[in-house]
Amino acid sequence: MGRAVGIDLGTTNSVVSVLEGGEATVIANSEGARTTPSVVAFAKNGEVLVGQSAKNQAVTNVDRTISSVKRHIGNDSWNVEIDDKKYTAQEISARTLMKLKRDAESYLGEDVTDAVITVPAYFNDSQRQATKDAGQIAGLNVLRIVNEPTAAALAYGLEKGDKEQTILVFDLGGGTFDVSLLEIGDGVVEVRATSGDNKLGGDDWDQAIVDWLVEKFKNANGIDLTKDKMALQRLREAAEKAKIELSSSQQASINLPYITVDGDKNPLFLDETLSRTEFQRITQDLLDRTKKPFQAVLKDADVDINEIEHVVLVGGSTRMPAVTDLVKELTGGKEPNKGVNPDEVVAVGAALQAGVLRGEVKDVLLLDVTPLSLGIETKGGVMTKLIERNTTIPTKRSETFTTAEDNQPSVQIQVFQGEREMAQHNKLLGSFELGGIAPAPRGVPQIEVTFDIDANGIVHVTAKDKGTGKENTIKIQDGSGLSQDEIDQMIKDAEAHAEEDKKRREEQEVRNSAESTVYQTRKFVEDNKDKVSEDIQNKVEEAAKAVDEALKGEDIEAIKDAMEKLSAESQEMGKAIYESEAAQAGEAGGAEDAGSEDPNVVDAEVVDEDDSEDEKK
């Protein structure tokens, strides 16, 4: 069996670490650096360059150099075409992983076969699966996909002994942002809550500088540098260097000779000075976007700021003074821990987790969570949640649903992720059909839907017809990644529209209840028409028709009133039956049983896709 490593597959840089004598060691790459740029280039001579060598030639090979691919992983519609061949984000990421694997093997002098790879805590299922696929493409057996803040807390917490403590991990990397609250003690690392933004990171700070430079140059020379790919790449590199310089200096000089030429073919130079104050001004909106996830984590974990004992900064972007100051402000003046390397701590935690899984590290338990709620669409477009956000994983949950129509042969299971009450406002992860349901009146078949989230955070959904034993399963991996707006809006919209969502859900539940009551009442009358007078039957039918008519409109109170009248007439009918001959009493009891519901069946109905669309119209 080969060795196992921990890998932090980052947006801008990646790190590999290994356990040696029970201690995690960060492995330097073939160039001697402890971090490897997540950049892949296809040279014109056919050679594939990875890491620093790829980054070094980016200016002269712009169209064939790929960086920040992590922002696209899990998005099936994204690819890059080189020499008439299309490469997915998984394939490009695999190139970086292959270099890390080779460098680790060179250092260890033996094969590396297994790896724990980290991902942002807010990565969805398709992004996690795509990361796992990238590992497999690189020739690695991926032991586990671990959330980056959790890995960081694992690395930090194990050094602190058995004392119980509450840790806040603020992780701002090159392309993603996460904030997590964890409890550590007695070898247990438990995530209480997590939140974040998959499209916020150091790249955005770089882009803000690029935009500032482009505007300055355009005002001075009347030329838009964004039209020149080579010039734009030089601007990006200069912006990154200026950002890093401003972490330790009050100003940075940006000097790019021969950046372009004017209309007369005369060379033009770019020479600007960016102060730290100006840099913080043009990036303030990016900094502000970290506040809501921070507040959401405290709220979800039900933890007061004063209860946080340690603050751990992760990701190179946390070196920016404005970020450090903001974290200090948000945590009530608490000084962030300086004892961990923000670039390396995630890979160290991943190596420790690899050791746990291989039995090399004892008495450590890692309890992670799922970042967003998961559920299915039920009748009326309602989002019926089976697993709430911040549930500890791995986890499994089952609910029993039923059909919406008589003799319904199949059900369409649509799986959603998000916090809104109505399914259409959440993210559709995937769908599948369960067919072969035996003909039966609606409400009779029992369809058991099971959500199973594994330790990697990857979702498996199974639907099973309890009557026939037939089942179907889907592993959620076919959806595209959640965009920044989608993720940011999910929690935000859920709060902003909470009352509206609640009202719509209640209205739909009233409609569902009314339809079900009318159906059951008419069925009951049909089964017992020889026991009640025609006059009573007519009154019940008139009341049922009134409910039908009310359901055609939008007035929920009218539906409720019609339901009350139908209930009153139904009670009169029941009274008449019970006052009939004693010989009919047993049959009346049976009829009552026929109208009752299985207490284990959820009062929601799975509908066919077509029917679902009709409900939404």
UniProtKB/Swiss-Prot annotation:
Belongs to the heat shock protein 70 family. Keywords: ATP-binding, Chaperone, Nucleotide-binding, Phosphoprotein, Stress response. It comes from the Bacteria. The lineage of its organism: Bacteria, Bacillati, Actinomycetota, Actinomycetes, Mycobacteriales. HAMAP family: DnaK. Residues 496-515, 567-617 are annotated as: Disordered. Acts as a chaperone. Residues 579-604 have a biased composition (Low complexity). Residues 496-512 have a biased composition (Basic and acidic residues). GO terms for molecular function: ATP binding; ATP-dependent protein folding chaperone; unfolded protein binding. The modification Phosphothreonine is found at T176. Residues 605-617 have a biased composition (Acidic residues). PANTHER family: HEAT SHOCK PROTEIN 70KDA (PTHR19375). Disulfide bonds: none annotated. This is Chaperone protein DnaK. InterPro entries: ATPase_NBD, Chaperone_DnaK, Heat_shock_70_CS, HSP70_C_sf, HSP70_peptide-bd_sf, Hsp_70_fam. Induction: By stress conditions e.g. heat shock.
